[in-house]
Amino acid sequence: MSYDWEKMRKEEWPVLETMTFLDAACVSFAPQRAVRAVKEFADMTARQDEANSSAHHIALDDMRHKAYAEAQKLLNADPEEIALIESTSHGLNIAAQGIQLEDGDNIITTNLEFIQVALPWCVMRKEKNIDIRVCKPEDERFTVESFAALADERTKIIVMSTIEWCNGWQTDLKALGNFCKEKGIMLVVDAVQQLGVTKIDTKECHIDLLAAGGHKWLNSPYGTGVLYVNKESLSKIKQSYAGYLNTTVPEGGWGAYWENPAAPSVNNWTFPETARKYEIGGTSNYAGAVALGESLGLVNEIGIENIEARVRQLATYCMDRIEEIGGTVITHRDPGHFGGIVIARLYDDLDVDRMILKKLHARKIFIAQRFTDYVGGFRISCQYFNNEKDIDTMIEGMKDLIQEIGREPD
């Protein structure tokens, strides 16, 4: 299916006419449809069209519902498997607090993670004698065998990023999920660098819990993200929060309940056995959820298969162009194992590359520089709203600076 990428870019991201933006792996821009939805929500908060304040609150809450439906569609999940969260950090903490570990248990993560991935379990080590085992890649590639080599009968969780932020490697989730299911290990994933980029089918991949903030590749404003919890895992992950809005709604609704003179302040509340029980259950970030619903809707409207093909085409073009000017590409081109992140270097001297980065920014060419455990370099994000011209502009800027430095890349 062909798609008019340039038309979409002009209609949804007019800001891209003012700069060369290749940094969606850090933060991205909201499309105009999300901006309009937030403005509509803000207008609703300035008036009341409903019969009373309780009905008004419910109407505002209902505006979040599109985000659930669109996330469910994108992940090929069931309705009871989707919740909305504040961020990836929020979702990972739900996993850490909810999956019970005992002294002597271990979890496995990798050496290339963003610090938040293992952080909740690092804190847990202060109270429990748990072991955090760190998987290191072979030639910067993580495989099932990489994780299996560290696993034993006390391994309870594998927690990792589906696409690594500092080398762009996309792990085979289906294979890793099958391994975890066979061994009785919980698979917890940070999908913030993959969701909205390449396909994640939760019916094919045995993932227990997935968390992804919306402000990167989903192009949503800050403060809202997606939580997926496999329905087979709902009983295995303890509920962290108890808010009245994630209890079972009383007969007649909350408005009728509050008007009941006999309503008790203490009750034996029940919670639906769905992923929404992990939400905080209070007044939430409605505006963020409204925007997230629109941004997810755009991804589904285009089609994740189309986006995946587009992003990988741009990433491949980017890698080719960097190599043309003598740069070194760190990201592997293995089919199915890269998304929109391209990691590259021009010089072995990091100070020189930092200077290049600063001068590119001065030209309004926005990329990043990221490292973990000595792996990394320039991080160039090829989002579906980008085009070859963006990459060419970056390359021309790099060529000018190489000439200014006076020596070829290392």
Place the predicted regions along the sequence by residue.
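Pyridoxal 5′-phosphate
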Residues: 1-410
